[in-house]
Amino acid sequence: ASDVYKRQGHGSSLSCSSSGYNSSDVNQLTNTDVHPFFWSVACVNGDFTGVTCFAETWLRATHNETGEPTGAIATLMSTINQSWAPPMEGQDHMNLILTEMSDNSQSRSFGGISMNGCMKMNDTYGSSGNEMTDTWTCFGDPSVMVRTKAPENIEVSYNSSISSSSSFDLFCSLEEALVTLSVDGEILASEIISQG
């Protein structure tokens, strides 16, 4: 499971300056079953030169007793000082995509949502947006699929026996659902439902 963190405010390479939340606080996290993804509009939270920066700390955090991961699955943080309006535009568009309110983008990966937000920022602010895109760095796995609600059971129908052919029909009540065929825990194929 994941939560989304969106932050705007002053930053440093080791902290969210305006709140005082810093790398030491991240290293004290105890959650081992919920790992957030994080978009930050703040100066230098991703400045990784010469120090383990705030963004890296989020990815490396582990429980002090068990050693299990407690940090983020991915972050988008700036390596330089950020301006205000362009990255706010980018983050606003990331939120629209994440909550499926954007008419122009259907990205589901952290990197896809992040880059689509950057492109909207670039379209709106030109070279000022481009500068922010150049220095907003994705830490973690950009291909991780993110969502705003837990997966649900869906109604699916298919033949009870499947031949060894390379395809078979499956019908589902939810358009664009991801379905997976597995045998004894081994994934054989995954596809997206199209036209029921």
Where would I find each of the regions flagged by the language model?
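Active-site-proximal C-terminal subdomain of hydrolase catalytic domains
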Residues: 41-42, 46-154
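Alpha-helical scaffolding within the catalytic cores
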Residues: 16-30, 51-64
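Aromatic sugar-binding surface patches on proteins
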Residues: 194-196
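Short, small-residue-biased leader/transition segments that mark boundaries at the very start
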Residues: 1-5
